[in-house]
Amino acid sequence: MEAKLKWIIPAVVVVLALVATLDSAGAAPNDRVARGKYLVMVGGCNDCHTPLKMGPNGPEPDLARMLSGHPESLAMPAPPKLGEGPWGVAVAATLTAWSGPWGVSFPANLTPDPETGLGKWTEKEFIDTLRTGRHLGRGRQILPPMPWFNYGKMTEEDLKSVFAYLRSIPAIKNKVPQPIPPDAG
């Protein structure tokens, strides 16, 4: 019996060590989606990519349009001129339009809608976008207030989890406007 324990204990230790070193690439898809949901929530993605609506206690996320970006139906007037001084940014009440020295930017539709969201994006394009700060990893610059430079430091597995979660939510058709460049004059 004692001889068997000499072999069983090291075998169990080896198996546990192997299991502990596995990354979550082999994790079940539901585990990846759950991790992605957690990262989206703590990362504050809803703060800008989900429009606000007025609720009984003031502004609250419009979960019927969760992560669909700036509402297509909400035409924005020209942003106010802020002039010189420490105030350099104007924000729409929905938190889905931002104006500053870069011009006007609108948070993107992160839902899996194939026409207006991330539905046709590959996992690689999503990761490249967050790593490079360029649309689809090669296009136009991602503008403030999107903190791509912070999210781009996430692990590959975390970014894959975020993408998996975004692919799992309901697709919402919502064409977000293109950014508006700053005034030339």
Question: Residues of each region from the PLM?
Answer:
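Surface-exposed patches in mature extracellular/periplasmic domains of secreted proteins
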Residues: 47-51, 138-143, 173-180
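The canonical Cys-X-X-Cys-His
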Residues: 36, 42-52, 126, 162, ...
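Bacterial N-terminal signal peptides
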Residues: 10-20
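C-terminal capping alpha-helices of c-type cytochrome domains
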Residues: 120-136, 148-177
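Electrostatic cytochrome c docking/interface patches
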Residues: 23-41, 53-59, 78, 116
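Bacterial N-terminal signal peptides that target proteins for export
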Residues: 1-12
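Gly/Gly-Pro-rich "capping" loops immediately C-terminal to redox-active cysteine motifs
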Residues: 54-128, 142-155, 184-185
